[in-house]
Amino acid sequence: MLRVLLAFLLLLLVVPAAHAQPASAPPADAAAGQRLFNDMGCWQCHGYQGQGGESGPRIGPQPLPWPVFDNYVRAPSGTMPPYRASVLGEADLRKIHAYLTSLPGPSPNAPRPR
């Protein structure tokens, strides 16, 4: 009976921890992501803060969810060149995603980029 009770208590501790949300990206990841965003030239089409521009759509401040973002960057449609893992590794791409996620949203009165 004591073993069953201990097992039950252990489950009460383990199950919530398994379902806990992952920690948000540390600020260092976002700062490194901003440097990569600039170094890789993403800003040339998407603007310095991912707001979009003449040749690239808005990708920030609320980027696509990670799996969709990853797939799009690896095999984009349109004129964007593909950034294969040999050019931009997953860790670096996650940093760029963290940067885009960290950007503040646009002002409610700001005009929408074209």
Predicted feature descriptions by range:
Residues 4-16:
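Bacterial N-terminal signal peptides
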Residues 28, 32, 68, 91, ...:
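Extracytoplasmic/secreted proteins, especially bacterial periplasmic and envelope-associated proteins
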Residues 30-38, 44, 48-86:
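Gly/Gly-Pro-rich "capping" loops immediately C-terminal to redox-active cysteine motifs
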Residues 14-38, 53, 105-114:
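Electrostatic cytochrome c docking/interface patches
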Residues 86-114:
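C-terminal capping alpha-helices of c-type cytochrome domains
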